[in-house]
Design a protein with these regions (language model features):
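Alpha/beta-hydrolase fold catalytic core
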Residues: 1-38, 62-63, 260-272
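Conserved HGGG/HGGXW glycine-rich cap/lid loop of the alpha/beta-hydrolase fold
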Residues: 25-75
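Active-site loop/oxyanion-hole signature of alpha/beta-hydrolase fold enzymes
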Residues: 67-107, 249-256
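Flexible "cap/lid" loop of the alpha/beta hydrolase fold
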Residues: 114-122, 128-162
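Active-site nucleophile elbow and catalytic-triad environment of alpha/beta-hydrolase enzymes
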Residues: 181-197
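Short beta-strand/loop motif that positions the catalytic acidic residue
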Residues: 201, 207-209
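Conserved alpha/beta-hydrolase "acid-adjacent" motif
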Residues: 214-219
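Catalytic active-site module of serine/aspartate enzymes centered on a nucleophile-bearing elbow/loop
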Residues: 236-272
Length: 272
């Protein structure tokens, strides 16, 4: 592990980073702050910073943030095995065991939120609370334009900020292309989660979506109804705008409000 310090708007926070051997993968992670562990799981084609760079330090004021980069993304090299949200969830569980963490909160965005749902389903004994942001658990829960975009997707359509962020960490264009192709293929073959599995989630949940997000508001509300111990936040804006994801308009007021909502959820003694 490597101990460093990082500055954010005149606030210096201690950062520990390293690689964990999990299920044949060398998973990169960064740790900020102290308190109850909160694992951050980025979206598809992304890195820690592109997804969470604008909220990470605000969240680390009240808990120990453990930000990860999943298989084939950022600092974490690809290996010869399929990409799946189930495998990603098992990798997070293995990381927590490696770090000797018995229970954690999990915050996933987009693809990372699909992993978060799988984590709560597959590893309930180490799940404290979950934050499920901008996702759906069945194909019909997403707007049809998403699937049209996925079926016609080409590398040239990948957002340039995500390309630049990947290459800054890993200059291999072959690795970048492979990551892109594997992420797209995973979405093109998206597997529904059964309603009964969603209903079986017992961990307190905060479900967040933009009002112009990839998931329909109706589906997001259905997920809220199915997870009995959940809260729902529909926030103005598109996919990831409320956390300042790198490809979205940067609205500092909206981002600060989202951090406040998340911290409030995590620090509330009981969710009903």
């Amino acid at each position: 592990m490597i101990a460093q310090s990082t500055s954010n708007k005149n606030k210096t926070q201690s950062r520990t980073s390293g690689y964990a051997p999990v299920n044949g993968l060398n998973m990169y992670y960064e740790i900020y702050g102290s308190g109850m562990p909160l694992v951050l799981i980025h979206g598809g084609g992304s890195t820690i910073q592109t997804t969470f760079g604008n909220v990470l330090h605000g969240l680390a004021k009240t808990q120990q943030v453990i930000a990860v980069e999943m298989q084939a993304h950022g600092h974490t090299a690809d290996i010869d095995r399929p990409l799946s949200f189930e495998q990603d969830a098992d990798d997070i569980a293995a990381l927590l065991r490696y770090l000797h963490i018995d229970k954690a909160n999990i915050f996933g965005f987009s693809n990372g939120a699909s992993t978060t749902l799988q984590f709560a389903i597959r590893h309930p004994e180490i799940t404290n609370r979950i934050i499920v942001a901008s996702t759906f658990y069945k194909k019909t829960g997403a707007h049809s334009w998403l699937w049209e975009m996925m079926s016609n997707s080409t590398f040239e359509s990948m957002p340039h900020p995500l390309i630049d962020a990947f290459l800054e960490i890993n200059p291999s264009r072959d690795a970048l292309h492979k990551m892109y192709e594997r992420d797209v293929a995973r979405m093109q073959s998206f597997k529904d989660i059964q309603d009964e599995q969603i209903q079986a989630i017992k961990a307190p949940a905060l479900i967040i979506s933009g009002d112009m997000d990839v998931a329909t508001i109706e589906h997001t509300c259905e997920m809220h109804r199915f997870i009995s111990n959940s809260r729902l936040a529909i926030i103005p804006g598109g996919h990831g705008e409320y956390i300042g994801e790198i490809t979205t308009p940067q609205n500092s007021t909206l981002i600060a409000a989202t951090v406040s909502i998340i911290n409030g959820f995590l620090n509330t003694t009981e969710v009903k």
